[in-house]
């Protein structure tokens, strides 16, 4: 998207003040959730988000391109997550068949299609037996388990 922007193939009608392409941490995952969830014919929610970043008069083609880029990034994230889980279980050995992994976090919980994409990637990796489940307050539970393990010595 940075390349397309600098080549003026994206946001052609814009005044060139789109710093969210180059400013770190300016485009939050909540925007990705909204963009992926926008199934309207004119992608009005995508346009609304772009307006928040002072990108006005975006074309439908611009909005489709942004949605496609976000789709690719989030799909890659889901596939990377699946590969990390697979790698951990591969390292642990064959005795861990049919395990459940608890996951906490807003990306896993709220991002459209994310859970499905993680599960699909695990199946592609030959591990449909790994079940990923949402664990609300997972970080608190994880901290408690670590503290328990340390206390037991």
Language model segments and positions:
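ATP-binding/phosphotransfer module of carbohydrate and carboxylate kinases, centering on a glycine-rich
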Residues: 1-153
